[in-house]
């Protein structure tokens, strides 16, 4: 596959055009996608039918997400926000309390983001360079917290995204010349009552009309799809293997590593691996620090959140039952132990887990221990 050009016409003798005309571009894409399946068959992956089945499903989800982003909404001259992760597309320990939006941009251009604040508990805007479909990482190049937004009386806002700060003092999201994406994170404590922010983006320093599809663009998009599926699945499998080395613990995750993978710089992450027998439970005790938000969640080997549509697989400051002293005890088990704050493993006896402190200045480590199901105390 070849690099993209900006031309809308092409020399019929060009090799990229020839690959499109004779079908090689599709055949090479399918062959490369097939090779991405090696991550599911790796010796390090648990020899468990559920993990394997979820692995194959995971690759279809990554492929679907990548096709949507790189094929349908990939033009930085005419960007739009799309759901990067949702209830059936998951990756990288996606947060069940979050709604993630992403739009492609080019750091050398200038954009306006318009929206209404809504009542969502936490809202953040990040500019990022690279991408799982480009470099295999997402480096933060700028960040704007909704707490710093200037709003009008109706809760509306405008943000300028650019390399240079606007001279009129407008809300500004800093970009770098290498910035390639803007991500919006919305975090809810109460999923039923909080109103999500509404956001849209447009280029303001030139035409904002989508370019026509070309052989070069289709070639580049398919290449990026394969790279995302391959790189993201391999990277997060490596994370899971690291967590497995010290099971049933929740140490703080390297902040630099989290940010390089696209994590929010305002969040302290505690990642771990749970490993249980059928008659065991994992007890997680926390004393949340003063912070904007906290939660605890379960995920599978592939760092996909478990199915939060139908099972209680996560708790936050609004849904967890607290003790009188403010501490919280949560219990991870495959069957209900009959105590508050049970998190359902959805049939898994092992998997990954994460605690987040958002906007904290102190970082207490969660305390974790394994007990027999019949010995769980509230």
Where are these regions (language model features)?
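A compositional/structural signature for long, glycine/proline-rich flexible linkers
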Residues: 2-378
